[in-house]
Amino acid sequence: MGYIKRMALYMSVFLLIIFIVGCRNMKDEQKKEEQTNKTDSKEEQIKKSFEKTLDMYPIKNLEELYDKEGYRDGEFKKGDKGMWTIYTDFAKSNKQGGLSNEGMVLYLDRNTRTAKGHYFVKTFYNKGKFPDRKNYKVEMKNNKIILLDKVEDTNLKKRIENFKFFGQYANLKELKNYNNGDVSINENVPSYDAKFKMSNKDENVKQLRSRYNIPTDKAPVLKMHIDGNLKGSSVGYKKLEIDFSKGGKSDLSVIDSLNFQPAKVDEDDE
């Protein structure tokens, strides 16, 4: 009789242990699922925040931006129609162990319907030398870049006058095709980052390879960065980076941004 009681007690304890372990595993799975849902939610919010501008891509004629309204908040003065800032640069590691980047920034003032900016060539060195920075003033008329400074280098002059922003040929309307991103958030800034693997079959990747010297077959990573409120902010900014880097000290990427802010004075001197 005592033997049966002991066995019943052992079985009760055993079943209790199984129940406790099962509950704990269930809670762990629930927490994991909640965390996944939270990450997915932020991923979708980041995508939606970018979609507001990326849905306009490709903007083959940049003068269309004069008639495009962006996100407005209390930073805008009464009557200010605002200004679009479009930016693209190509950055790569150089032989000096530093970084070279070349590109253009253009400020399109919706009040005056004028576009001014500059083409830049920058070289950053690894040790003991200040970076070299050269800016060449440009303006845009009839959707054509006009070089305002004298440039002796015929190849550089040609690159400036024929320059196209990423936003003029990119098509990122199907952001939903980029899934399972690596999302990181800094609530203190706030800032939001998402990374998505791209394919070499992607038309945007093919476009970049046809326009820039990209000596690697490695498929790039699409990086999305937001500073400021996800819903929109004239004091924050958003940028895209298509990163072809091999890792380590190798840098090879194209950076693009299109932001809307209150109109400024002497934008091309910034």
UniProtKB/Swiss-Prot annotation:
Subcellular location: Cell membrane
Entries under Pfam families matching the protein: DUF576
UniProt keyword annotations, A-Z: Cell membrane, Lipoprotein, Membrane, Palmitate, Signal
Lipidation (S-diacylglycerol cysteine): 23
Lipidated sites in chain (N-palmitoyl cysteine): 23
Membrane topology note: Lipid-anchor
Family annotation (PROSITE patterns): PROKAR_LIPOPROTEIN (PS51257)
Segment forming the signal sequence: 1-22
Record-level GO cellular component terms: plasma membrane
InterPro entries in the cross-refs: Csa, Csa_sf
NCBIfam families given in the database record: SA_tandem_lipo
Family: Belongs to the staphylococcal tandem lipoprotein family.
Official protein name in the record: Uncharacterized lipoprotein SAUSA300_0417
Organism: Staphylococcus aureus (strain USA300)
